[in-house]
C-alpha cells in the first residue's frame, strides 16, 4: 500500500470554555450512510464530525455538516475528491486566541494492519507530535494502543460488510483526558465488542 501523498494538512479545533469538546467520528460511508446515522449523530451533539475516508458521494459531507462542522480526509475510493487531503492533523487548542496544541490527532484512512499501526503511519504520527491516530478503511471498530499511540477506528456507518456492526465513534475531550466510545448506528445505544 503506498504512503499517503500529502504529508500534512493541519486544522485547529478549539475547546469549549469549560475545557471540553465532543467529536463524532465516522468512516466508510460509501455514499450510503445508515438511514438512522444522522439522527444518532445529532443526538450526541458533537462540536465537530471527523470523517476518516471512503466517503463516496460528497453530498454525504454536506448532510453531515448540517449536524456539525465536518473535517474529512480522502479514502482509497475517493479518487473523485482531489480537494480533500489524504492526511489531516487536528490540533485541539484552548481557544482560537491560544493556538498552542493541547493534543494532536492524526486522521488517516488506512492506518493499521490488523491491530498494529502501519510503520509509515506511526512514523508520521511521531513526526507531527500526534498522541492518537484516527483511521478507517477496515470497517472494524477498534480502540487500542501501539508504539505509544492510541489508535481509534470508528467502524463504518455505510452498508454492512460481512458480519460487522454499523457503528460510529465519539471522542470526548475533558480536562482529565480523552474518552473514546462506539455507538450502534441502528439503535443509538453504546456498542461494545461481543
Residue ranges and their predicted role:
Residues 2-99:
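Core catalytic region of metal-dependent phosphoesterases/phosphodiesterases
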Residues 2-22, 89-101, 128, 152-194:
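Binuclear metal-dependent phosphoesterase catalytic core
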Residues 25-27, 48-54, 71-76, 106-109, ...:
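Active-site neighborhood of phospho(di)ester-bond hydrolases with catalytic His/Asp-centered motifs
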Residues 30, 56, 77, 114, ...:
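Residue-level detector of flexible, active-site-proximal loop/helix-junction positions
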Residues 36, 61-63, 83-85, 117-119, ...:
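Short, well-ordered secondary-structure micro-motifs
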Residues 54-59, 80-83, 107-111, 135-141, ...:
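Short C-terminal domain-edge/linker segments immediately following a structured domain
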Residues 71, 113-177:
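Conserved beta-sheet core of the metallophosphoesterase superfamily
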Residues 78-129, 159-162:
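Active-site-proximal segments of metal-dependent phosphoesterases and phosphodiesterases across multiple
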Amino acid at each position: 500500500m503506498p504512503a499517503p501523498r500529502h504529508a500534512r494538512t493541519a486544522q485547529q479545533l478549539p475547546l469549549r470554555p469549560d475545557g471540553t469538546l465532543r467529536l463524532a467520528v465516522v468512516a466508510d460511508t460509501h455514499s450510503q450512510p445508515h438511514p438512522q446515522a444522522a439522527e444518532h449523530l445529532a443526538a450526541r451533539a458533537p462540536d465537530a464530525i471527523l470523517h476518516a475516508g471512503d466517503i463516496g458521494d460528497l453530498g454525504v459531507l454536506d448532510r453531515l455538516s448540517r449536524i456539525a462542522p465536518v473535517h474529512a480526509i480522502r479514502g482509497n475510493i475517493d479518487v473523485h475528491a482531489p480537494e480533500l487531503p489524504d492526511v489531516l492533523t487536528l490540533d485541539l487548542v484552548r481557544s482560537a486566541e491560544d493556538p498552542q496544541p493541547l493534543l494532536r490527532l492524526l486522521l488517516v484512512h488506512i492506518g493499521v494492519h490488523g491491530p498494529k499501526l502501519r510503520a509509515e503511519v506511526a512514523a508520521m504520527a511521531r513526526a507531527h507530535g500526534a498522541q492518537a491516530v484516527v483511521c478507517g478503511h477496515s470497517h472494524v471498530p477498534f480502540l487500542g494502543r501501539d508504539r505509544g499511540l492510541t489508535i481509534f477506528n470508528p467502524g463504518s456507518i455505510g452498508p454492512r460488510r460481512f458480519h460487522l456492526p454499523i457503528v460510529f465513534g465519539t471522542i470526548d475531550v475533558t480536562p482529565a483526558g480523552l474518552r473514546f466510545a462506539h455507538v450502534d448506528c441502528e439503535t443509538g445505544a453504546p456498542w461494545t465488542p461481543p
